Swiss-Prot record:
A Pfam family hit: UDPGT
Gene3D superfamilies assigned: Glycogen Phosphorylase B
Family: Belongs to the UDP-glycosyltransferase family.
Source organism: Arabidopsis thaliana (Mouse-ear cress)
Protein name listed in UniProt: UDP-glycosyltransferase 76F2
E.C. no: 2.4.1.-
InterPro entries: UDP_glucos_trans (IPR002213)
Binding site for UDP-alpha-D-glucose: 279, 338-340, 355-363, 377-380
Length: 464
């Protein structure tokens, strides 16, 4: 009897942490279902393949091979113009010679690409003769907003005008004008091109995989189905599926991990405010100063992640008030990095002050932790509005109100006065996330459909 060939999936993430991590989680889900997975990655921000020995990693060099790489590690630091950066990525990295890069080794079912690569991935797919699926790293509600951008421009909502910030967008309830998922950029037309290309790429694909679940975004998913007219697979939360992925990395300094764990273990249940603004968001020095004093004045225990370079114009903590670290004593910990999944799951954590990136939002929902919402750009504004007004599992703390007394007020309110009500809603949503992953849950059923869908494609090996 002829031995059955292993089906292979090619995955093409955008090289940012918030996009790469969910793609790797999806790769683990596919691998757990018996697929071989090859990860294509740009030559910068290249991940450590040794952390994922079950996958094959291939470097895609930019199309002007022999020239200096047009992008460098420094170009992806906080505060860079993301529209310019994504435009460069799309320009230089979406027409690789995949036959040479990936080689042979199994039958290729499909190419799964980050939706932001847009229609150019169709060129990639044609080169290898397979179908293309896209993965969205933000929620369905945000994608609905992106599909409406041409209408929003016609209606005068975009570009955003300061005088209309609190006006409701009647076409996209419950969003206000200030919630529209835009990015501050010197090339607004470039942003429109990227988003239009993303939407059109999704329409041309053989399906869209979403890191969300039906009970969380039922109405938004219905809207997306109507607009895209392709199969949708909301199989999230990705990170809760059983896979053979290794645990998330620890701090390089094992002693730091042990000190932090020991400190958390000494705190009362649900007493700690965990603060983290993700891998790309940047804040101003005066905001950093106010956050520090707001946390201190709350008199609540806090764990605050401050990435090197997160505060514009500084390396790390030099902007802290003189004597601040000594002043907080054992009240708080300021660190460069933590394992977020482990932190949110710790019983001492009672609230998450977040930038509302989609990964952070989903992870907090899964652990039943109330959120303090300070969105910075793009989909974070949409996520924050849904967290506060639709799912009712958080409170808003806008950047325009980033003043120590307001910070103290909101943090205290979430942890003490309104905490009970928020926690109850959080636990209900957490239970829905657990149910969707059960054997008869919606995400489990969609995963079965996704696997069948991928296997139904006309398989073809790489052209020789």
């Amino acid at each position: 009897m002829e031995e059955r060939k292993v089906k292979r999936i090619i995955m093409f993430p955008l090289p940012f942490t918030g996009h790469f991590n969910p793609m790797i989680e999806l790769a683990g889900i596919f691998h757990n279902r018996g697929f071989s997975v090859t990860i294509l990655h740009t030559s910068f921000n290249f991940p450590d393949p040794s952390r994922h020995p079950q996958f094959t990693f291939r470097t895609i060099t930019h199309k002007n091979e022999g020239e200096e790489d047009p992008l460098s590690q420094s170009e992806t630091s906080s505060g860079k113009d993301l529209v310019v950066l994504i435009s460069l990525l799309k320009q230089y990295y979406t027409e690789p010679s995949l036959a040479e890069e990936v080689g042979e080794g199994g039958t290729v079912c499909c190419l799964v690409s980050d939706a932001l690569w847009g229609r150019n991935t169709e060129i990639v797919a044609k080169e290898i003769g397979v179908c293309t699926m896209v993965m969205r790293t933000s929620g369905a509600a945000t994608f609905c907003a992106y599909t409406a951008f041409p209408l929003l421009i016609d209606k005068g909502y975009l570009p955003i005008q300061g005088s209309r910030l609190d006006e409701l967008v009647t076409e996209l309830p419950p969003l206000k004008v200030k919630d529209l998922p835009v990015i501050k950029t010197k090339e607004p037309e470039g942003l429109n091109r990227i988003l239009n290309d993303m939407v059109e790429g999704a329409k041309l694909s053989s399906g869209v995989v979403w890191n969300t679940f039906e009970d969380l975004e039922r109405h938004s998913l219905m809207d997306c189905r109507s607009k895209l007219q392709v199969p949708l697979f909301p199989i999230g939360p990705f990170h809760k599926h059983r896979t053979d992925l290794p645990p998330k990395p620890k701090n390089k300094d094992k002693d730091d991990d042990e000190i932090l764990t020991d400190w958390l273990n000494k705190q009362a249940p649900q007493s700690v405010v965990y603060v983290s603004f993700g891998s790309l968001a940047a804040i101003e020095e005066n905001e950093f100063f106010e956050i520090a004093w707001g946390l201190r004045n709350s008199e609540l225990p806090f764990l605050w992640v401050v990435r090197p370079g997160m505060v514009r114009g500084t390396e790390w903590l030099e902007s802290l008030p003189c004597g601040f670290l000594e002043n907080i004593g054992h009240q708080g910990k300021i660190v460069k990095w933590v394992n977020q999944l482990e932190t949110l799951a710790h019983p001492a954590v009672g609230a998450f002050w977040t930038h509302c990136g989609w990964n952070s939002t989903i992870e907090s929902i899964c652990e039943g932790v109330p959120m303090i919402c300070t969105p910075c750009f793009s989909d974070q504004h949409v996520n924050a509005r849904y967290i506060v007004d639709v799912w009712r599992v958080g409170m808003m703390l806008e950047r325009c109100k980033m003043e120590r007394t307001e910070i103290e007020k909101v943090v205290t309110s979430v942890m003490m006065e309104n905490g009970a009500g928020l926690t109850e809603m959080c636990l209900e949503l957490k239970e829905k996330a657990n149910v969707c992953l059960s054997e008869d849950g919606s995400s489990s059923k969609y995963l079965d459909k996704l696997v069948s869908h991928v296997l139904s494609f006309d398989s073809s090996a790489f052209a020789s």
